[in-house]
């Protein structure tokens, strides 16, 4: 993902990378800053956000990371994009943002992009132990009155100051792809790309009919699925 984004829009739109490894025991935690993120490249939810390095149990984290690497995630839900990947761990910078949960973890702005055009923005705030809140917006920032199993954010959420830049970045990254979800962070220095996924929710999310039809009409395929 990082190589694709770098080639498409430039390295400046990616969080700083500290380490890439196939063996979590090789991570030199003493050289890392107090805040960082560890994640695997071959599945969903394989991520650990560290906001205070002094409070972590290193051996427990190493064991957790090894557990991720042992899972053939592509076989779990039949997601072709994860099949056959050379599994690895990445240690990245902790991204600071004014849109964050109570632990300081930045919100995910998830852009549903069809052939280079943003159709929907899913704002996801909160990782355990914080509560998770999800609100969904059109690109105009009009809120879509639906929930998908999570409560919406409390009160109206102000659009990020760099919303237009975020939409433009998501569309540039997704250009010439029939569909991809582009996950961004809003930072004081501009948007950063956190993740790309071709099959959000393993393709099993149930949207209300109105939104399902809206998204379906925007998905133009030369051949049927």
What are the roles of these predicted feature ranges?
Residues 84-90, 135-193:
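A long amphipathic alpha-helix within ATP-dependent nucleotide-binding catalytic cores
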Residues 21, 42, 93-95, 113-115, ...:
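Short, flexible loop/turn elements at secondary-structure junctions
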Residues 12, 104, 113-119, 175-179, ...:
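Coil-to-beta-strand transition motifs
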Residues 32, 55-149:
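Phosphate-binding site of ATP-dependent enzymes
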Residues 168, 186-225:
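C-terminal active-site "lid" helix and adjoining low-complexity regulatory extension at the edge
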Residues 1-54, 66, 71-80:
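A conserved helix-loop-beta module that forms one wall/lid of the active-site cleft
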Residues 2, 25-28, 44-49, 57-58, ...:
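Short catalytic/ligand-binding loop motif for oxyanion handling, primarily in non-cytosolic enzymes
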């Amino acid at each position: 993902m990082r190589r694709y984004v770098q080639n498409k829009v430039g390295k400046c739109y990616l969080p700083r990378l500290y380490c890439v490894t196939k063996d979590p025991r090789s991570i030199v935690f003493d050289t890392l800053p107090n805040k960082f993120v560890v994640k695997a490249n071959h599945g969903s939810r394989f991520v650990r956000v560290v906001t205070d390095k002094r409070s972590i149990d290193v051996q427990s984290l190493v064991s957790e990371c090894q557990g991720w690497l042992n899972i053939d995630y592509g076989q779990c839900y039949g997601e072709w994009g994860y099949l056959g990947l050379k599994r690895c761990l990445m240690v990245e910078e902790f991204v600071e943002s004014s849109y964050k949960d109570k632990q300081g973890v930045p919100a995910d702005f998830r852009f549903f992009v069809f052939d280079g055009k943003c159709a929907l923005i899913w704002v996801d705030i909160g990782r355990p132990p914080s509560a998770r809140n999800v609100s969904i917006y059109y690109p105009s920032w009009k809120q879509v009155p639906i929930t998908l199993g999570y409560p919406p954010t409390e009160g109206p959420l102000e659009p990020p100051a760099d919303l237009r830049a975020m939409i433009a970045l998501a569309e540039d990254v997704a250009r010439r792809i029939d569909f991809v979800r582009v996950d961004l962070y809003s930072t004081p220095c501009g948007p950063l790309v956190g993740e790309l996924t071709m099959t959000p929710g393993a393709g099993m999310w149930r949207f209300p009919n109105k939104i399902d039809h809206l998204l379906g009409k925007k998905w133009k395929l030369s051949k049927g699925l």
